[in-house]
Amino acid sequence: GICACRRRFCLNFEQFSGYCRVNGARYVRCCSRR
């Protein structure tokens, strides 16, 4: 799924951890699904 990372959008790979992959290189915090 897709979630908003503060002012950006990325693919949320880990919904439990709340982290997503950006540009396939860096990891940023994403909105976690409750």
From Swiss-Prot:
GO terms for biological process: defense response to bacterium. It comes from Oryctolagus cuniculus (Rabbit). It is found in: Secreted. This is Corticostatin-6. Microbicidal activity and inhibits corticotropin (ACTH) stimulated corticosterone production. PROSITE patterns: DEFENSIN. Disulfide bonds join 3-31, 5-20, 10-30. One of its GO terms (cellular component) is extracellular region. The keyword Secreted applies. Pfam families: Defensin_1. Keywords: Antibiotic, Antimicrobial, Defensin, Disulfide bond, Secreted. Lung, spleen, small intestine, pituitary gland, adrenal medulla and plasma. Belongs to the alpha-defensin family. The lineage of its organism: Eukaryota, Metazoa, Chordata, Craniata, Vertebrata.
